[in-house]
Design a protein with these regions (language model features):
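Short alpha-helical transmembrane segments in multi-pass integral membrane proteins
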Residues: 1-36, 90-155, 199-257, 313-378, ...
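N-terminal transmembrane alpha-helices
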Residues: 20-52, 56-57, 73-85, 89, ...
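Transmembrane alpha-helix boundary and packing residues in multipass membrane permease domains
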Residues: 36, 40, 51-52, 69, ...
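Small-residue-rich hydrophobic transmembrane alpha-helices
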Residues: 62-122, 159-178, 274, 287-351, ...
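Short runs within selected transmembrane alpha-helices of multi-pass transporters and secretion channels
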Residues: 83, 152-170, 178-189, 207-222, ...
Length: 473
């Protein structure tokens, strides 16, 4: 189940058109999910470390990061969206056994994503010292919040390279290297944070520097594995001269544009949520930030299973095995809901300890515990939304799922949060979140059951000019 050779053999069987048994599908899902789950959990631990180290500096330092943290998520979201446009194509080509085109797509991705990340860095740097004011942050936290945001923004090119390399390796079925790199990033983050926050005495900017340096080191190593060590994607395997193909870029835009728009508007919604929370005071801002970090430990398994779903659905679709696509969709969504239901129970029971790890301030701990227990009830349906969306991405179906996410976030969560915050404070904001996640999960279950997410079944061309499977349209 956890043997890489066994996973590779099963993936090769998909590409060759073989029929997998139910046990083989489960084995492959678990085998690909476990490393990805570990990677996701490690990423959360890194945020825990940042929060815990900064939390010891007091509520003001925690609030300064919490004020702009939702804005920094936009960087990762945009970088992920742009890289997915190319990595989904790579998964489809690998599924069709066309490794040459898979490497061609990756070359295009390197150029396009570098240009994009530099543009994002420039734009973010220009607004860094205005953002805290826009978010209604107090004067006592504005300066540190601006510095944290600016330093993090400068890491975007490395962040983009790391996300792209990770997604490419996952598209090829290699979940182990991204997982190991996530562990390495966590270790480096601890070391760099200790050095800059405590030894150098830099406080909040030191936390940003520690994170940025760990991102840069890990991105460089991960890119080396993707570009030079992968048995499928290593650039040295190409014998022909590289030729620019605009069709790959156009396909990437078709896949990425809805996801990028979704990330922008979803991050905008998170920023609006911060805007709603900010007037509730520094304790509420800090409790909100810590609760989000604590909850992420519970939903990261869903994202890990979602990574496996994207890879398996993508390669199955590239191989023309559309029945297998649906089987993987059902199994991954069911597994995600079961795992996150269990994590919801854990979160409810251990909420005080989870918040307590990050702050010694009693008011923040009490408030954070209350909102975590509200959210625990929504975890299974949150899993349906996470894994369901990943299934659709693997199939190249991104427009309607993006619209579903946006309608749910803006039409349900923010509307309810604005109303409930007035009457119930932070607890009202998180009640709105729990209701919205349940609604969104329901939408994705309906989409997977009755929607036309598997486009190839609807009569789209199944053979390309070379006689192989049509992987992209």
């Amino acid at each position: 189940m956890f043997n890489k050779k066994s996973n590779d053999a099963l993936l090769a069987g998909i590409r060759q058109g073989k029929t997998l048994t139910h046990n083989e599908m489960l084995s492959l899902i678990v085998g690909l999910s476990i490393p990805s789950i570990l990677a996701q959990v490690t990423n959360v631990l890194m945020f825990y470390i940042d929060a815990a180290m900064v939390g010891k500096l007091g509520a003001t330092a925690s609030a300064s990061i919490g004020l702009v943290e939702s804005a920094t998520w936009l960087f990762g979201g945009l970088c992920s969206a742009v890289s997915l446009g190319f990595s989904v194509q790579v998964a489809h080509f690998i599924g069709a056994n066309d490794f040459v085109k898979a490497r061609q797509v990756m070359r295009h991705a390197l150029v396009e994503t570098l240009a994009f990340s530099l543009l994002v860095t420039l734009c973010a740097s220009l607004i860094a010292f205005r953002l805290p004011g826009w978010l209604r942050g107090g004067d006592d936290i504005a300066h540190d919040a601006s510095l944290y945001f600016l330093i993090y923004a400068l890491s975007v090119p490395f962040l983009q390279l790391g996300i792209l390399s990770s997604n490419m390796l996952k598209s090829a079925g290699n979940m182990q290297i991204p997982s190991i790199m996530s562990v390495l990033m966590c270790v480096l983050d601890v070391c760099f944070n200790y050095l800059f926050i405590y030894v150098a005495g830099l406080g909040v900017p030191g936390a940003a520097l520690g994170t940025v340096l760990s991102i840069a080191v890990v991105a460089s190593v991960e890119a080396w594995f993707a570009l030079f060590r992968s048995s499928i994607l290593a650039l040295r395997l190409d014998k022909e001269r590289f030729v620019w193909m605009w069709s790959y870029v156009r396909n990437a835009v078709k896949i990425s544009a809805p996801i990028a728009a979704q990330y922008v508007l979803m991050s905008g919604a998170q920023i609006v949520s911060t805007y709603i929370v900010a007037p509730l005071g520094n304790f509420a801002i800090a409790a909100n930030t810590f609760a989000i970090t604590a909850e992420s430990l519970c939903y990261m398994p869903g994202y890990g299973i979602g990574d496996a779903a994207t890879t398996l659905v993508g390669q199955s679709m590239g191989a023309g095995q559309y029945g297998l696509c649906r089987s993987f969709a059902k199994l991954t969504v069911g597994m995600g809901m079961a795992v996150m239901a269990l994590m919801g129970v854990v979160m409810y029971v251990f909420a005080p300890e989870m918040i307590g790890l990050m702050t010694p301030v009693e008011e923040i701990r009490d408030l954070g515990t209350q909102v975590l227990r509200i959210e625990a009830f929504a975890e299974p349906m949150f899993a349906a939304a996470i894994v369901g969306n990943s299934v659709c991405v693997g199939a190249g179906d991104t427009l309607k799922p993006s619209l579903m996410n946006l309608a749910s976030m803006w039409g349900v969560r923010l509307t309810l949060a604005a109303v409930l915050a007035h009457w119930y404070g932070l607890q009202g904001v998180w009640t709105a979140m729990a209701i919205e996640l349940t609604f969104r999960g329901t939408l994705f279950l309906i989409r997977l059951k009755w929607g036309a997410w598997l486009k190839a079944e609807g009569g789209v061309e199944k053979n390309n000019a070379d006689g192989g499977r049509q992987a992209l349209l």
